[in-house]
């Protein structure tokens, strides 16, 4: 048969074998069957002894979560992009979404994410509860969650929230 003549790792992924994919994989389900089921999964987190300030480039192709462990030192802008060399507009198709989280450590003086850009272009997010945050939460960790939906060519809707953890 074709499968018995195939080579594991070259012609197919052998069960129980760790495999790294470097290109997008498409799994098509149907109207009655899900395309993919995960018993467990891990997301890549970048942990950095960095303070939130200025413009922070968030490369969504290399991390799902960023955790800044030093106290924020000023309000900041998050610029979402695929990577330093690829725009998010290029990496995503219309109708696709990506969800990422930015964890920010706050000291006794708290700051907040006061602007969002995608590929350097300003975007006005829709915040949970309808109101954008106007401050951070002192002596805690603020978790900013962003769901970015591509709605057209260079057009995005961002759903955002800020949650305090102590």
What do the predicted segments below correspond to?
Residues 9, 53, 95-97:
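Glycine-centered loop/turn motifs
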Residues 1-41:
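Fibrous stalk/shaft segments of extracellular and virion attachment machinery
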Residues 29-69:
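Extracellular beta-solenoid/beta-roll
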Residues 17, 23, 54-56, 114, ...:
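Residue-level detector of beta-strand structural context in well-folded domains
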Residues 19, 50-52, 140:
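Residues that act as N-cap/strand-start positions at coil-to-secondary-structure junctions
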